[in-house]
Amino acid sequence: MHKDVIIVGAGISGIAAGYNLKKSCPNKSFSILEGRENIGGTWDLFKYPGIRSDSDMHTLGFRFKPWIHDKSIADGPSIMEYLHETINEYKLNDNILLNHKVDSANWNSKKSLWELKINVNNDLKDMTCNFFFLCGGYYSYTKPHMPYFKNQENFKGHIVHPQFWNESL
């Protein structure tokens, strides 16, 4: 499958890229590939109690869909609702492909395009595109950074990483 543009990541940045591409280049084909089973990136992944933005939503949110809620520092569920509203309002659903993880991307100079290997539920698919736009996060979903704390081995409680929050806590 060939697209003019492949956007990687269906979080805030990928959704913004999709909106702007659709508005400014309506004749260009594009897909937003999301490696996980849901859109939202950080806001879908982290589920611990009290998760909220560390920046005000007037800054973090979209220029084309201003944040209109009373609380400018928003909780995670409110941000997810905002992202879903945006996708629906601007008809980006058909452009988003969930469970599509980029395994490799190679530039082919002879053909002047990107050749991608996409893992879709452990099945590799080939895709090509002219423009490859990376809008993914900066961390691993499966192997987060775990800092070492002095005397950590003597701590008698549970050490919990927020990325793997246990709902029973």
Briefly describe each language-model feature range:
Residues 2-3, 27, 128-130, 157:
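Active-site acidic short loop of glycosyltransferases
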Residues 61-62, 66-70, 75, 79, ...:
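Glycine-rich dinucleotide-binding loop and its adjacent helix/turn
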Residues 70-141:
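Feature captures the FAD/FMN-dependent oxidoreductase FAD-binding
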Residues 32-41, 128, 133-136:
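Carboxylate/His-rich catalytic cores and anion/metal-binding grooves
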Residues 3-32:
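N-terminal Rossmann-like FAD-binding beta1-loop-alpha1 element of flavoenzymes
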Residues 19-20, 44-45, 144-148:
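Short amphipathic alpha-helical segments
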Residues 37-85:
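Glycine-rich active-site loop/strand segments that organize a redox cofactor
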